[in-house]
Amino acid sequence: MDRYSRRNLEDLVVPNYQETSDSYPSPDMWGTGWSMNSSEAAEKCFDYDVIHNGFSGGLYSQMEMDMGTSEQVEEETKKLKASGCFDRSLHDFDEIQHMDDMFLSSILEDVPGNENFLSFKESDNNNSSSSSYLDTTDGREVPLFHYNWETCQDMPLMEEDAPMNLCEENKEEASAEEVVLQDLQRATEMLTDDTRKCFRDTFYRLAKNSQQKSDSNSDEFLEDRTRETEFETKLNRQSRGQSHIQQDGIQHEKYASTEETFFCSRIREFHHIW
């Protein structure tokens, strides 16, 4: 046995391998000579579903599809209308549409900006305006979405970023010294006050020692230069004195040789006379 729960009714218990009779129309629609348990009744019910609900499937025999004519279809349609099957189908469709609306409303509750849509839906239900719905191919009516253009116009426009002037950036490239100073500044900003003071005093001492060293080096250089100048002056003096002495000696030798030559010539003349 299978148990089926029905809405607003007690549970329905049916034997296994049998369909529930609650899904079929009333027994009066079948006319005389028909019963709910017969196979022909089930096939006729499937024929009705195929004709009016667009169901495509192999639930009825191919023989009836081939033998069925338009006149038979019209007769079956008239019988179904007379028995109230159409009213039952429309009632089911209204319930399904109501459930769809409830599901759609529950989804739109958490979506921002859905107040306009909900108010539009309520006004459509009250006024029953056919222009606010969109007809689909299966006969259903879907409410059109209403967009509030006034709120859209009040929204602020996005600000555009100013274009970057690459030429100026390329012209004003920082030197290596500036880059080092900027890096040092960023590093010192992350230090504490005590650490900054220690670094400051260290840099001051380093700069002072460097200045003193440069001054002492300059003084030593000047002293060395002075000594070299004095030594060069002495050498120049000595070289000039030696050169004078040499020149005087050469001149004296020349003079002595001249005197000797003259004296020798005078002696020879004197011998000739005697």
UniProtKB/Swiss-Prot annotation:
Induction: Repressed by members of the TOC1/PRR1 family of clock genes. InterPro entries: LNK. Residues 209-249 are annotated as: Disordered. Residues 236-249 have a biased composition (Polar residues). Keywords: Activator, Transcription, Transcription regulation. The keyword Transcription applies. It comes from the Eukaryota. Disruption phenotype: No effect on circadian clock. The keyword Disulfide bond does not apply. Residues 223-235 have a biased composition (Basic and acidic residues). GO terms for biological process: circadian rhythm; regulation of DNA-templated transcription. Interacts with REV8. Probable transcriptional coactivator. This is Protein LNK4. It comes from Arabidopsis thaliana. The gene is LNK4.
